[in-house]
């Protein structure tokens, strides 16, 4: 059994309009939500072998607050920033088969699209700091439409 998680970055700040989109940090609420969701995830006692992440400032800060000082190995890839569904899948397909648990930390619409594609479950919305937990019996490079099961989908507002 393989575990796959999709985490959308937490809410970003628009306080400084001179910043490029890539460089926007988390807002106060984003920091609180990343901490909250990280605590929820820790309560599940799930193990992550590797994180595949966009290198944007808000995804880096989301990972820092979500995991604290216990983040697993992170592989940053530019293709996850403004990613298409295919970009996300290509990153997952490249994961070594001995890895059993992967988290992708990125942006919408790709986090939403990947979750719906792999599970064939409709999600009304994938909010900032939303977390989807999937399970599959497939090899990483054999993931395809409907090949994963949605274990849970948690939103920060459900924990506030």
Locations of the language-model features?
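Domain-level recognition of soluble alpha/beta enzyme cores
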Residues: 122-153
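Hydrophobic packing residues within well-ordered alpha-helices of enzyme cores
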Residues: 62-66, 88, 114-115
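Short phosphate-binding loop-to-helix
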Residues: 80-96
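Active-site-proximal alpha-helix that buttresses catalytic centers in soluble enzyme cores
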Residues: 2-3, 7-79, 83, 123-127, ...
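A polyampholytic, Gly/Pro-enriched intrinsically disordered region
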Residues: 93-105, 146-156
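Active-site catalytic microenvironments for nucleophilic, acid-base chemistry
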Residues: 40, 65-69, 94, 117, ...
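Non-DNA-binding regulatory cores of transcription-related proteins
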Residues: 95-98, 103, 108-129
